[in-house]
Amino acid sequence: MFEKQYDVIVVGAGHAGSEAAAAAANMGSKTLLITMNLQNIAQMSCNPAMGGIAKGQIVREIDAMGGYSGIVSDTSAIQFKMLNKSKGPAMWSPRVQSDRMRFAEDWRLKLEGTPNLDFYQEMVAGLIIENDKVIGVRTSLGLEVFAKSVVCTNGTFLNGLIHIGDKQFGGGRAGERAATGITKDLIEVGFEAGRMKTGTPPRVDGRSLDYSKMTEQPGDDIPGKFSYSDETKPLSKQRSCHMTYTSNEVHDILKEGFDRSPMFNGRIQSIGPRYCPSIEDKINRFADKDRHQLFVEPEGWNTVEVYVNGFSTSLPEDVQFKALRSVAGFENVKFFRPGYAIEYDYFPPTQLKHTLETKLVEGLYFAGQINGTTGYEEAACQGMMAGINAALKVQEKDEFILKRNEAYIGVLIDDLITKGTEEPYRMFTSRAEYRTLLRQDNADFRLTERSYNLGLASEKRMRKMEEKKDKSLKFVQYLKDLSVVPEEANPVLEKRNSSPMKQSDKVFKVFSRPQITMEDVKNFSGVEEFISENELNEEMIEQTEIQVKYSGYIEKEKNNADKLNRLEDMKIPKNFDYSNIKSMSYEAREKLKKVQPATVSQASRISGVSPNDISVLLVYMGR
């Protein structure tokens, strides 16, 4: 069978659980991954894609930390796009369309090749907790397995309830049963629980679609990739997606089913994701819009199954079908399966520490949708961080926390712990106040050394990052030292409608002009030779351009981050008594008592805590 004592047990093998198990095992902890179905490891339950706005940055951060999501996203990709390329580098976000079946298979194979990792297929029905400390899990068959740390990554399975029109039934995902027992155990020891909702669109037969009535959405001409490692290569061929629109006719058909919609008849009370609303929610909330975009996404290289992005719904199946048949290109559509909504239990994340360990039960960690987030990438990064900290706790080493100025992962976890969430939380670039520092191109600079010190990133990765960093810095310095005369620069400046130079200047300064590109700079004497002699690749050249163009913004954000970190270093004593600080607002006292922030900086980010409250706190702490 398997051993009965582990360092770390991970409950659930979705995106969070898979990264948690990989991190803990790769750090040397004897790890057991328990899932209800070993054939469904790392399933893409919703859209067949990884990355996107802010999410792509997270995948690159996971990769820089030695996680598997970036590598698997590359090996299973069918299309690559760098989103927001017309904006500044802080907004660039990589995204891949994925082969759903290959994604899950590649994840399974990566995990099977990971040392210190065992697998078991069973439902975990309870947690074994003694003296406010988790010591193991109990399965539905009554088997008890013990561990020093447990990571719960239950996804949408905790008391999951699926809705299609006026039909509802228990399930954690289409065709899979819900998980029961854990919520009851956690409430009994004092946890607060809530319910959330998410939804998914119909899957259809691509052979029944008329793509000539849609707009093709190809991948990038020169595709990139997620992983910084040499383990993966950019795509040599790609599959296109397509775009079409709903219409007033489609909306009218959908409205016919509103009286049977669980969203509108009160059957679903939970809050769904604000930024991924159902089609019925969209036409209800945005009644002035006569059409909505639909993205038609292939599910893989060889399958005919297609995902209808933008048509998430829990309306009756007959209404879904009739409405889709009125969409341009879908006149003869055949369904593979209808869309549905699912309600599930979650635990407000203010009950966690920044390590993702629960405050109530020692050694118990939560990651993913159990914390109120939505999205594969958000789940995966939490899983990785929970797995790292679960392993560190077992090894009696210092905890690992990423700050808001160090990673989007740090922003996400800090938001959850200090602000909580009452609706499914997803990441956006706008949530990160230091997004110029947290770009997708420099995640390796920010995180690889930290990961290497944890024992996750390999020596090879570390050397590769150092070479990229050294060579790009050397190129920046070369451009600062190199002068260019007006006779050489002005023809280039004139072509770009940039004002001419009157005297010699440094290439760095000329390059700083917004109109001037790296291709222009290569025309100046010595630049091409420097690139060739120093064997600079495209990544190093791009890094140099960003450092030159955005040096002012980067410096400003670094200074702001340094100020924040001074507050981050001001620790608040554990179990600090806020009730005696009468000059602080009542709301602030209540919020601080509930969240119990570890630092003054965290306290300042809690909703309802004003700058004046922080000043009072600092005085009270004798600062």
Curated annotation (Swiss-Prot):
Keyword presence, Kinase: no
Gene Ontology molecular-function annotations: flavin adenine dinucleotide binding
Gene3D superfamilies: FAD/NAD(P)-binding domain (3.50.50.60), GidA associated domain, C-terminal subdomain (1.10.150.570), tRNA uridine 5-carboxymethylaminomethyl modification enzyme MnmG/GidA (1.10.10.1800)
Annotated keywords: Cytoplasm, FAD, Flavoprotein, NAD, tRNA processing
GO cellular component, one term: cytosol
InterPro entries per the UniProt record, alphabetical: FAD/NAD-bd_sf (IPR036188), GIDA_C_N (IPR049312), MnmG (IPR004416), MnmG-rel (IPR002218), MnmG-rel_CS (IPR020595), MnmG_C (IPR026904), MnmG_C_subdom (IPR047001), MnmG_C_subdom_sf (IPR044920)
Location, primary (coarse class): cytoplasm
Cell compartment(s), UniProt: Cytoplasm
Protein origin, superkingdom: Bacteria
Cofactor(s) annotated in UniProt: FAD
Positions that bind NAD(+): 272-286
Pfam name, any one: SAM_GIDA_C
Protein's GO biological process: tRNA methylation; tRNA wobble uridine modification
Residues where FAD binds: G12, A13, G14, H15, A16, G17
PROSITE patterns per the UniProt record, alphabetical: GIDA_1 (PS01280), GIDA_2 (PS01281)
Protein task: NAD-binding protein involved in the addition of a carboxymethylaminomethyl (cmnm) group at the wobble position (U34) of certain tRNAs, forming tRNA-cmnm(5)s(2)U34.
Subunit structure: Homodimer. Heterotetramer of two MnmE and two MnmG subunits.
Family membership: Belongs to the MnmG family.
Protein name per its UniProtKB record: tRNA uridine 5-carboxymethylaminomethyl modification enzyme MnmG
UniProt source species: Christiangramia forsetii (strain DSM 17595 / CGMCC 1.15422 / KT0803)
